[in-house]
Each structure stands twice: as C-alpha cells, then as structure tokens.
A protein has these predicted regions:
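Cytosolic catalytic domains that perform sulfur/thiol-centered chemistry
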Residues: 7-281
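Sec-dependent signal peptide recognition
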Residues: 1-7
Length: 281
C-alpha cells in the first residue's frame, strides 16, 4: 500500500499531456496525429518527419489587445490549414524549453481541444539524440476544427485586482528575478510585480541540461514550497502569456485544475497607470 502511494505521488496526474521523443518517433506519421513545429527558425533546414510548421507569432493577434488572442474563426482556419481536426491528437515542440509549445497547448485548451501534448525536451532533445529529420513540408488536407472558447481560463486585469491577497487564490509570476525587481523593464513603462504574487520562474520547472520537465514530485514541491496548493485557484502571468503557459502546463500536469492565464500580462499591467504595482523594498 505504501509503495502504491509513493508511485502515485511520483507520476503525473495527466501523463498523456507529455510525450517523449521515442513515442513521437514511433507515432508521428500515425493517422489522427499531427506534430506541430513551433520553433522560431530552422524548420526548412530540418524538422521532425511529418511535422507541420506554425510560427510562434501566428497565434498572437496584434489587433486584439490586451489578450491578443485570435478570434475563434481565425483559429479554426489556422488549425484547419494545418490538418488539425476535432479528433486530432496534436503534438507540439519548439527549441526554447516549451514557451512557444506551451502557449499553443494552452490556446488549444482555451478553444476546447484537450487532445494535445508537448514533446518532452522539444527539439533540443530530438537533435541531441540524433533522430531522423526531414526537409519536406507536408501539405495535409484541410480539416474541420471547431473552436469552443472557454473564457473562464482567461483572467482579466480586473480579475487580478480582485484576487490580490484573496484567500483561495494564488497569483504566480513566471518572469525572471530581474523583471520582478524592476531592473529589466523590457520596454514596459513600469517595473515590479503584482502584490501577493509568488515567483515560480518557468525554467525552474525544467531539467537545466535536458530541458525536459522535472518529475511530478519535484514540480509539486516547487509550488507547494511557495504556498501554491491544489485547492486554490491559480492565476499565472508573465509579460505576454508565453512563460505563464509553461507554469500552467506544469500545474495541469500534476493535477491542479482551477487554472487561469492573465493573458494581458505585464505588457498590460505595467503599461497602465491604474494598476497597483509592488516593488522590492
């Protein structure tokens, strides 16, 4: 019984959301599976065989502040062109530890498509293992994708203001210490952090060498040491919604369920004059 409890504590609550390179190598060409390459560059020079390409900037609508989320119609068209249908198993990877891949993972969940996973370790691990690559660009037949938005997954600035120091809600900051301290503004008008938020830098969730996600126990300890508990609603933020998506992915992976992305993020919060900002004393 003790051994069983230890085993349950060590595994992810949603292991289907994270697949390894061995699985991808064996199933990338399966009917019903679509691998999506979300690297900034390098697709034409070589990618996972069968993978289609989606630019990281394609899923950010510059005309739709403060969230910059694509419209349901635009996202449906985008997925349809990639050959992603309602029943498609989507596997996403990038070369940046998952910040682009996790963003698509989160947006797919937002639009009601839960059958999506990250390739653990991304392109870094695939290349390190000298796995097969291709320079072919697949042209999958257009598919029928239905966007079913879940607005409850997005926290607005007003939601965040109402959540500051609120029992039962924890705000998680996925940014660097320099951003939180206000030393690295990154073009934002004001520096600092949201009062009562706790820092969980997104890269701390990864093995520093392999860039694979840490074990369930390690991830759970990172959050619980900062007072982030499964019973709470968690609102994550960064600067533009990418790094926060990695935190939300990790939390979902270990079984947290009440998760929201403040998608306006520090780009909105730090550029407004009416949002409260805390600074390091």
């Amino acid at each position: 019984m003790v051994a069983m409890l230890l085993l349950q504590a060590a595994i992810y609550a949603h292991p289907e959301q994270l697949v390894d390179t061995v699985w991808v190598a064996a199933h990338a060409s399966d009917a019903g599976v679509r691998v999506v390459d979300m690297r900034q560059s390098g697709y034409a020079a070589g990618h996972v065989p069968g993978a289609v390409y989606l630019s990281p900037v394609a899923i950010r609508d510059a005309k739709a502040p403060p969230t910059f989320l694509p419209t349901p119609a635009a996202f449906e068209e985008m997925m349809a062109k990639l050959g992603i249908a309602d029943a498609t198993r989507v596997i996403v990877y990038d070369e940046r530890g998952g910040i682009y891949a996790a963003r698509l993972w989160w947006i797919l969940h937002y639009f009601g498509h839960d059958n999506v996973a990250l390739m653990n370790g991304g392109w870094t691990k695939w290349a390190a293992e000298s796995r097969a690559t291709s320079t072919d660009s697949p042209s999958p037949p257009a598919a029928k994708f239905t966007a079913r938005p879940h607005p409850e997954m997005v926290a607005t600035a007003s939601d965040v203001v109402a959540s500051i120091n609120r029992p039962g809600v924890k705000i998680v900051d996925a940014r660097t210490a320099a951003e939180i301290d206000g030393r690295d503004l990154r073009g934002i008008k004001r520096g600092g952090f949201i009062e009562s938020s706790v820092p969980v830098y997104w890269e701390d969730l990864l093995d520093p060498q392999a860039k694979t996600f840490k074990s369930a126990d390690e991830i759970r300890k990172i959050y619980q040491d900062r007072g982030v508990l499964p019973s709470q609603q968690v609102i994550a933020y960064c600067q533009v919604g990418m790094r926060a998506s990695v935190d939300l992915f990790a939390l979902h992976l270990i079984g947290y369920s009440n998760l929201r992305n403040y998608y306006g993020a520090w780009e909105e919060w730090g550029n407004r004059d009416d949002t409260p900002i805390a600074t390091k004393k």
